[in-house]
Structure formats: C-alpha cells, structure tokens
C-alpha cells in the first residue's frame, strides 16, 4: 500500500513486532526528471510534482458529481460542513472518471484539471492519470474502477447501453485549489 504513494521500506523495527519503518524522499535528484515517467515521478515525489513536458486536459464534471467526487470543494463554502458526507470514492486520493468522450489523447501521466461544467466553470481540482481504458461492458468497468467512481452500478449500465465505448480514467487526485 505505502509503495503506491512513493514510500520505501527502510528497515524493520528491532523489537520484532513485524512492523516496518517506511521513508519517502521529498526532493527529486536531477536524474529523476529524465529517468522516471510522469506517473512514476508523481508516485515517488507527489502529489503536486508536475513538469512542463506533461500533457494537460480540462475535464468537465457535472456539479452534483463534482461535489460527490471532490467534497472538499463544497465543504470549503460551508460554515458547518457535514462530516457524515463521506463515501469511499470521495475519501480517497485514487479516483475514477467515466465519460463517453471519443478522445484518444489522454495517456498515463497526463494532468487533469477538473471544473464544474454547468456551474461556476472554475477549476477546483487537479490530478494525474494512472490508467486509461476504453470499455463497453459494465461489469468490466465496475471491476476496473472498484469504489473509485461516483457512479452506481445501474448508472454505469445505462451509460453502456448505447453501445459506445466508455472512457475510464483512473487518476490520483493531486490538489484541491483553495478559494
């Protein structure tokens, strides 16, 4: 688990409890910029380490889904945020975005800037693509996304009913921009 976020096993505790000490290097070496892919770099030093060579995309999200996927964006605007509004997909750094886009440009390591499409139109969150899939079978989509998506099983089935491939973007949330 910890390796998914750039931590390395450093040593085992001396009292033989089976516990390990993990460490994470916070500053990259010059060679890391050329040796590692953008995703590997983000895993090792991120979140928030981007370079000028990465592709970036603006991603529209309908307000209600945006609020579920990124609840911190609405909590900042509330005087008394509700602490019970937490689902597994909203309480994670690794999330999934589904859409019917025909785009084939998005690749692993690309930066995604999410904005509310029918609301304020402001960019509030960014992330980095971990994996890109094009799928038609709802069960495959559910298997790939797990609990990382805001969509319920029936919504995914409806989305797939048109016979069109669904673009599945698994991404790591890097930052939510404060207001």
Describe the residue ranges of each PLM region.
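Short, flexible beta-strand-to-coil junctions
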Residues: 116-120, 175
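Conserved active-site/ligand-binding neighborhood in enzyme cores
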Residues: 72, 96-104
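Short beta-strand-centered aromatic/proline hotspots
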Residues: 122-133
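Short gly/pro-enriched beta-turn/loop segments at secondary-structure junctions
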Residues: 52, 107-109, 122
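Short coil-to-beta transition motif at edge beta-strands of beta-rich domains
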Residues: 101-116
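Short His-Asn-centered micro-motif
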Residues: 60, 115-116, 126
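Short, structured beta-strand/loop micro-motifs enriched in basic residues and often containing a Trp
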Residues: 87-98
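Contiguous surface segments at macromolecular interaction interfaces
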Residues: 1-77, 87, 134-179
């Amino acid at each position: 688990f910890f390796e998914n976020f750039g931590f390395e096993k450093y040593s085992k505790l001396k009292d033989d409890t089976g516990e390990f000490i993990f460490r994470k290097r916070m500053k990259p070496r010059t060679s890391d910029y050329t040796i590692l892919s953008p995703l590997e770099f983000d895993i090792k030093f991120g979140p928030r380490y981007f370079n000028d060579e990465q592709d970036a995309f603006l991603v529209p999200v309908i307000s209600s889904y945006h609020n579920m996927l990124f609840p911190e964006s609405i909590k900042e605007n509330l005087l008394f945020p509700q602490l019970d509004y937490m689902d597994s997909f909203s309480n994670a750094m690794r999330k999934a975005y589904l859409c019917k886009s025909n785009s084939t440009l998005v690749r692993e390591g690309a930066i995604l800037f999410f904005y509310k499409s029918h609301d304020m139109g402001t960019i509030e969150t960014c992330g980095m693509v971990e994996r890109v899939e094009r799928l038609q079978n709802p069960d495959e989509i559910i298997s790939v996304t797990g609990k990382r998506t805001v969509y319920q099983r029936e919504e995914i089935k409806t989305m797939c009913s048109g016979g069109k491939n669904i673009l599945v973007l698994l991404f790591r949330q890097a930052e939510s921009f404060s207001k």
